[in-house]
Every structure is written in C-alpha cells, then in structure tokens.
C-alpha cells in the first residue's frame, strides 16, 4: 500500500481508530489492508513488522565517549580491568621468560589481544543502540484516540506510549532511565559500557564479549604454562604467588563471561532480547523467523 492510496482512503473514513495488521511474510491480507485514519492526524503507516517508517534513527551515531554520567565509575573500572592484567604481565612475568623468541611472541600476542579487546570495547561505548524519533511527539489523548495495534502472525500487540518522550513506542522499544531515551529493540542497559544495548549495537556487544573470552583464556594459559616452562628459582616465590592469584582471577572471569556470551548467541539466534527472556514477554516468540534471518537483523 502506497501513500497515495492511504490519502485517498482518508477522505472516505471518519473514524478515530487505527488498526495496523502485519503478517509475518509481509503480505497484508484483505482484512489488514483496511487502515482507518483520523482525517485530522498525520498518516502513521508501518513499512514492515519490525520498524515504523518515521521511527527509524539508525543514522544517529555517537561521536563522543560516554565517560561521564552516573555510571562513569563503572566505565573507568572496566578500562582498568583490561589494562592492568596485561600491564602487570609485561612488568612481572614477560621479563622472566628465558627464550627471547617466546618473550617477544607472548608480548605481541598478549598486547594484541588487549588492544583488540579495548577497540571492541570503545566500539560498543561509542555506538548508537538506535533511538525512537522524537520529532513525532503526540499527546496522551491523541494516543488513546489512535489506539495503534500491530498484528504479527496470529498475535496482536498494542503499541505503548512513552510519557517521557511523548511518542508511540515501537513494539520492542523501552525507555531507558539512564540514557533518557527510548531504545529500539532494547536488550539491556550495560553499566560497564555506560550504554544501552539495542538494535544497532547488539552484534558489536557480542563481539566485545567474545574478545573478553579470548583475553581471559590467554591469561589463564600463560599463568599456568609459565611456571612449568621456567625454573621456580628464576621466577621467585613472589611471582609464583602473583601468577596463581592472577590465574584464579582470570578463571573466575572466564567462567562468568563464557556463559554470558553463549546466552547472547542464543538470544540472537531465536530473536529475543534479555528483557523479553527474563520477563517472558512475546509468548511463543512470534518474532522468531529462523536462525539465519534472526542473525541478519543484527548484522
């Protein structure tokens, strides 16, 4: 249905209720082709089941680091968690490796993994999760008159109104009290990246988690292998204790992050968010279009 057809229908209809029906295969049936629009309101039409035309804001990108605000402490602590481990290995462990070639290899690999992890971290911090368009504000009374409903497969959902942003929210959008914006397909707000994870940065967040997993794995392997390769007297008791404590810390981080990583791989594969999974929203997951199609939505 194009805009001209909608405008022609507007001249014939005098009702204040909008019913928007959208089938999973994007082909509107005869019943869903009837869109009733108030003659004194702008046309509100959904291009597909996922993103309303005037709600798209994927061009909005963040250019400044989010190193301020109520969660800046967690932001800086996360930075230190990445820099201190490899920095301490460079100072206390790498110099004790006898073979120069192994010393160089470990130095390069360790620092390279750290730099890649830091890059992926800043990529998430500075990315835009996707925001609702604030240029289309309406009042609560207008929202109640419109009463927008969206039908997906055999399930019907009423689109909610955000009283803070004064807009009709997309089906999977939620208002974040930290970002003070409505986030498209909000998964969760992550204090460690001081940013929301949403429609346009969920994949970046997953890549960051994978980098952290490899970072922890390298630290574990290095701390376990080094004492066996080098003589104890060369390392000294202090360094051995340091490596044991460091290995235990890396193992605890690894055991925490790996399940978290796989949980996000699973959620993307079935097209669910953390919020929907915890609150059991979207029962039977009507938005699941198959693994490949679900991954295309975040890529």
Where in this protein do the model-derived segments appear?
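Membrane-associated feature with strongest affinity for ZDHHC
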Residues: 2-299
């Amino acid at each position: 249905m194009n805009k001209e057809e909608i405008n022609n229908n507007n001249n014939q209809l005098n009702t204040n209720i909008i019913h928007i029906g959208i089938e999973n295969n994007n082909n509107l049936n005869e019943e869903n082709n009837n869109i009733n629009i108030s003659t004194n309101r702008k046309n509100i039409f959904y291009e597909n089941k996922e993103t309303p035309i005037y709600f798209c804001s994927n061009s909005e990108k963040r250019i400044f680091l989010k190193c301020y605000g109520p969660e800046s402490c967690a932001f800086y602590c996360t930075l230190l968690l990445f820099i201190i481990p490899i920095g301490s290995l460079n100072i206390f462990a790498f110099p004790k490796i006898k073979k120069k070639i192994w010393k160089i290899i470990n130095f390069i690999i360790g620092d390279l993994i750290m730099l890649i992890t830091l890059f992926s971290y800043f990529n998430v911090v500075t990315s835009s999760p996707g925001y609702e368009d604030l240029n289309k504000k309406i009042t609560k009374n207008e929202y109640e008159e419109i009463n927008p409903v969206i039908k997906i497969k055999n399930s019907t959902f009423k689109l909610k109104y955000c009283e803070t942003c004064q807009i009709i929210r997309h089906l999977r959008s939620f208002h974040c009290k930290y970002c003070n914006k409505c986030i498209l397909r909000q998964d969760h707000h992550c204090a460690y990246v001081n940013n929301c994870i949403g429609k346009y940065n969920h994949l970046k967040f997953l890549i960051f988690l994978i980098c952290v997993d490899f970072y922890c794995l390298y630290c574990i392997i290095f701390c376990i292998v080094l004492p066996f390769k080098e003589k104890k007297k060369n390392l000294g008791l202090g360094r051995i204790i340091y490596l044991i404590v460091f290995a235990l810390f890396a193992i605890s981080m690894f055991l925490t992050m790996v399940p978290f990583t796989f949980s996000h791989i699973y959620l993307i594969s079935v097209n669910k968010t953390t919020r929907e999974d915890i609150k059991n929203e979207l029962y039977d997951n009507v938005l699941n279009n198959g693994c490949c199609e679900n991954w295309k939505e975040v890529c």
